[in-house]
From Swiss-Prot:
Binding site for heme b b566: H97, H196
GO cellular component: mitochondrial inner membrane; respiratory chain complex III
Name of the gene this protein is made from: MT-CYB
Keyword Ion transport: no
Membrane protein topology class: Multi-pass membrane protein
Protein name: Cytochrome b
Subunit structure as annotated in this protein's UniProt entry: The cytochrome bc1 complex contains 11 subunits: 3 respiratory subunits (MT-CYB, CYC1 and UQCRFS1), 2 core proteins (UQCRC1 and UQCRC2) and 6 low-molecular weight proteins (UQCRH/QCR6, UQCRB/QCR7, UQCRQ/QCR8, UQCR10/QCR9, UQCR11/QCR10 and a cleavage product of UQCRFS1). This cytochrome bc1 complex then forms a dimer.
């Protein structure tokens, strides 16, 4: 009798994806983040579902319902903070996952890569709408500022913003629809994740050397299942340390004040994981230009397969490209820092220089360095 694992139509799919999957023998811990993102998504959906059981999406009661969850619901505070800090862990894993893809040239699997970029957009949209739901000061003003950016679109901008708001300002209609979208998007993300994996398993995983590894494959289970479990334990350890010791470390104190349309907070800023894009947005004095730069700062990832000029796939054997890559990482840290600072000298000029450098590295410096490294190969 053949094993049910290999014959059953449904179990067979799981078997080919997680058990008998041929994987390169040399993939490092940087390849753990895919599974960690899967765990993050599961944590977010489960905690989010339990929060939705007690949350009310009405402007009058939203803030109170979150307070009620934290004070009166059994372990409500735990669920709420796991969900809030789970989002931070999600983005940490996302950024490391994308960074791994850039460093090791994984973007040459362009279907997998482009779906990954769409996933990044979807997760960012979900996180933004989730931040609006507690209806604190930063929720309200964040929603107002970010949705208002769409008014920069010529001709249809103002109509579009009022259509999204469901009125002439961010109000009850906006909150209700954001809750609806915030609830449905994670399931759309789950479907996209399956497509992401489908395309990945068409080609097989990349590896640190960037070379074809067909001649040296090992089964995913038990080797990488054990390795992934270690990553999951570390992820849960860090998440629970955040949740139980400093749950508000990454939040904004302004969000503990109920939303008030008559009182603007002194510094409107999004959650930390959007600060780099927010800094790029603010560094351009023109509204439409800023919005375009904001969208392009993420959309530019789709250009990496086209901009890849090197004869080698990975950066493992390209020290000059490695230097430029780490300068890009430092630049993103700088942008994140600037995004959280007030709009005044010297932060404005630092933000503008960091934004220019970000686009320069991706569009000019990295391809140029790659071409230069190709000439060095001929020596």
């Amino acid at each position: 009798m053949t094993n049910i694992r290999k014959t059953h139509p449904l179990i067979k799919i799981i078997n080919h994806s997680f058990i008998d999957l041929p994987a390169p023998s040399n993939i490092s811990a940087w390849w753990n983040f895919g599974s960690l993102l899967g765990i993050c998504l599961v944590i977010q959906i489960i905690t989010g579902l339990f929060l939705a059981m007690h949350y009310t999406s009405d402007t009058m009661t939203a803030f109170s319902s979150v307070t009620h969850i934290c004070r009166d619901v059994n372990y409500g505070w735990l669920i709420r903070y796991m969900h809030a800090n789970g989002a931070s862990m999600f983005f940490i894993c996302l950024f490391l996952h994308v960074g791994r893809g850039l460093y090791y040239g994984s973007y040459t699997y362009f279907e997998t890569w482009n779906i990954g970029v769409i996933l990044l957009f979807a997760v960012m949209a979900t996180a933004f709408m989730g931040y609006v739901l507690p209806w604190g000061q930063m929720s309200f003003w964040g929603a107002t500022v970010i949705t208002n950016l769409l008014s920069a679109i010529p001709y249809i901008g103002t109509t579009l913003v009022e259509w999204i708001w469901g009125g002439f300002s961010v109000d009850k209609a906006t909150l209700t629809r954001f809750f609806a979208f915030h609830f449905i998007l994670p399931f759309i993300i789950t479907a996209l994740v399956m497509v992401h994996l489908l395309f990945l398993h068409e080609t097989g995983s990349n590896n640190p050397s960037g070379l074809i590894s067909d001649s040296d494959k090992i089964p995913f289970h038990p080797y990488y299942t054990i390795k992934d479990i270690l990553g999951v334990l570390l992820l849960i350890l860090i998440l629970m340390m955040l949740v139980l010791f400093s749950p508000d470390l990454l939040g904004d104190p302004d969000n503990y004040t109920p939303a008030n349309p008559l009182n603007t907070p002194p510094h409107i800023k999004p959650e930390w994981y959007f600060l780099f894009a927010y800094a790029i947005l603010r560094s351009i004095p023109n509204k439409l230009g800023g919005v375009l730069a904001l969208v392009l700062s993420i959309l530019i990832l789709m250009l990496f397969p086209i901009l890849h000029m090197s004869k080698q796939r990975s950066m493992m054997f390209r020290p000059l490209s490695q230097c430029v890559f780490w300068i890009l990482v430092a630049d993103l840290f700088t942008l994140t820092w600037i995004g959280g600072q007030p709009v005044e000298y010297p932060f404005i000029i630092i933000g503008q220089l960091a934004s220019i450098l970000y686009f320069m590295i991706i569009l000019l410096i990295l391809p140029a360095i790659s071409l230069f490294e190709n000439t060095l190969l001929k020596w």
